[in-house]
């Protein structure tokens, strides 16, 4: 799964720690999501999409392999 979390975080001029704080998760969680090493829960994905004013589908794209 690919995502635009890093791009959208930069657009809002947020650090990983600031984004993590807004979402009540650790900075390491944000780092892992950005590096595609961790897929967020549905609840976290929805929170992120709302924060970035995107749909979940726009923020997270499933590889069609």
Language model: regions and residue ranges:
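Short amphipathic helical patch at the helix-1/turn junction of helix-turn-helix
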Residues: 10, 38-39
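Residues in the helix-turn-helix
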Residues: 18, 29, 58
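Phosphate-coordinating loops and pocket residues in cytosolic domains that bind phosphorylated ligands
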Residues: 61
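Short, Lys/Arg-enriched C-terminal cap helix and immediately downstream tail that follows
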Residues: 8, 42-43
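DNA major-groove recognition helix of helix-turn-helix/homeodomain DNA-binding modules
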Residues: 44-58
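Recognition helix of helix-turn-helix/homeodomain-like DNA-binding domains
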Residues: 25-38
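Short basic helix-loop element that most often maps to the first helix and adjoining turn
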Residues: 3-22
């Amino acid at each position: 799964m690919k995502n635009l979390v890093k791009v959208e975080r930069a657009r809002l001029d947020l650090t990983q720690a600031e984004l993590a704080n807004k979402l009540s998760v650790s900075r390491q969680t944000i780092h892992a999501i950005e590096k595609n090493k961790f897929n967020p829960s549905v609840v976290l994905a929805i929170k992120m999409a709302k924060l970035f004013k995107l749909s979940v589908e726009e923020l997270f794209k499933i590889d069609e392999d």
